[in-house]
Each structure stands twice: as C-alpha cells, then as structure tokens.
Regions:
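Short beta-strand or tight-loop elements
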Residues: 39, 63, 104-106
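Oligomerization/assembly interface segments of phage tail-like spikes and tubes
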Residues: 59-72, 84, 117-128
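Short, solvent-exposed beta-strand/turn "edge" segments of beta-rich domains on protein surfaces
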Residues: 54-60, 112-114
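Acidic-leaning, charged glycine-interspersed low-complexity segments
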Residues: 86-128
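Small/polar-rich, solvent-exposed N-terminal microdomains that initiate assembly or binding
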Residues: 1-57, 75, 79, 86, ...
C-alpha cells in the first residue's frame, strides 16, 4: 500500500552516503520526538490520491511527501536539501505492497523560524 511511502523515502535518504556525511543518521518521520542537534531531516506524507480506471480498478496512487531540512546554518541547509533532492528525485523502488514508479520534485521553499533555517521540498511519487 502506498500509505507506506515513508519506507521508500527513508530507504532512499538513508542509502545516500553524501547525505549521511552531512546529517549522520538524523532522518525522522513526522517528528523528532525529542530535542536533537542540528542538522536533521523530517519527512511526512501530505496526501494520497488513488487512481482508478473507468471500471473502478485501482491502478496506483499519487502520493505527496514533504521533506523538511532543519539547520542552524543557511548554506548547510541548502546543501542538505540538494542531497535530499538527489536521493529522491527520479528514484524508483520495489517493496512488498507497492512499487514506486516515478518521483518528481514539485516545489521547494525556505523559511527561518526560531533561529532555524528550514528548507521544504515537496515530492510527488507515483506508485502501483
């Protein structure tokens, strides 16, 4: 099921050696749960839209995932965001319950909140 898209996101991000050099293993789903040091990455599923044929057969889903990079240094946050993009964009994956057949960066923005530089990237994943 595409509801498990987080497994794909985590795998691709944690498999990136370049990203690991920048953030170690600080990749979290939805929340860090506890206070941690910078920099780190958080991801969350924003939406899931099922796709059906005219005969109502499910053909897959389009899943939107937001990945946020948090750092105390602006240039570092941008560098990490670039590595996140490299790790996810156009990457496919096969899992027990679903396959990721396409991944595209849909948007990116940045912010500064409570002494933290934030880079937000939104990806669209097509699954079957």
């Amino acid at each position: 099921m595409s509801l498990s898209i987080g497994a794909h996101v985590y795998k691709k991000l944690s498999d990136s050696t370049e990203l690991a050099k920048l953030i170690s293993d600080k990749i979290y789903a939805i929340s860090t749960k506890t206070e941690i040091s910078f920099p780190f990455v958080i991801y969350r599923r924003n939406s899931l839209v099922p796709e059906y044929t005219k005969d109502r057969y499910g053909t897959g889903d389009t899943v939107s995932v937001e990945v946020a990079v948090a750092s105390d240094n602006y240039l570092n946050s941008v560098t990490i965001a670039e590595e996140v993009r490299k790790a996810l964009e156009n990457k496919r994956g096969q899992y027990d319950n679903f396959n990721v057949i396409d991944a595209k960066l849909m948007s990116a923005d940045e912010d500064f909140i409570e002494d933290t530089f934030i880079q937000r990237l939104v990806f669209s994943f097509n699954t079957e």
